[in-house]
A protein has these predicted regions:
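Aromatic-residue detector
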Residues: 21, 34, 38-39, 111, ...
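Structured adenosyl-cofactor binding patch, chiefly the S-adenosyl-L-methionine
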Residues: 120-158
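Long, charge-patterned amphipathic alpha-helical coiled-coil/hairpin "stalk" segments used as oligomerization
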Residues: 89-130
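RNA substrate-binding interface of SAM-dependent RNA methyltransferases
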Residues: 1-87, 148-157
Length: 158
């Protein structure tokens, strides 16, 4: 299992399927803390209840906030990362650094639910990181799976 201190957040989506897929991906790859923020339309009315059912059945936690700053205020992570495309990222995913931080406290990783997913203001709310393996934009669910798989490998090896 990935650390109980990992908080995976999906921000700014209007797709109920994307919300459900994000939750299923997190739970399927051993992340138990699934967070949603700025979820609108059918994603909020249908996607969140579907995701909540899946997460709770798997023994996980699902939280819902109106914005990223609310997540940070309520959960007080020691570090916040924004998982973005190479175009917006400042450095590749620092897996070893994240593993060390998870031993010390909560780490929030935010994934944008639409393209580009995060506003300029939101990009300043954490450290922007990208997946080195990805050479062009991929969907946020694939990016989440890539991140969690890479993190799991580093945790197993440490």
């Amino acid at each position: 299992m990935i650390s109980k201190n990992l908080l995976m957040a999906f921000h700014n989506s209007h797709s109920r399927k994307a919300v459900k897929y994000f939750a299923d991906t997190c739970i399927g790859l051993s992340c138990r803390n699934v967070i949603f923020s700025k979820i609108t339309s059918s994603a909020a009315s249908i996607g969140i209840p579907d995701a909540q059912k899946s997460v709770l059945k798997a023994g996980g936690n699902l939280l819902f906030f109106s914005d990223i700053t609310d997540i940070q205020e309520a959960l007080e992570p020691s570090k916040s990362y924004l998982l973005v495309s190479r175009k917006y990222g400042r450095k590749s995913i620092p897996y070893n650094e994240i593993v060390t931080e998870l031993k010390l406290g909560k780490v929030l990783v935010i994934v944008g639910g639409t393209s580009p997913g995060l506003t300029r203001r939101e990009l300043d709310l954490g450290e922007c990181i990208f997946a080195d393996e990805v050479i062009s934009d991929i969907n946020p669910i694939a990016l989440t799976a890539l991140f969690l798989t890479g993190l799991s490998k580093v945790i197993k090896d440490s």
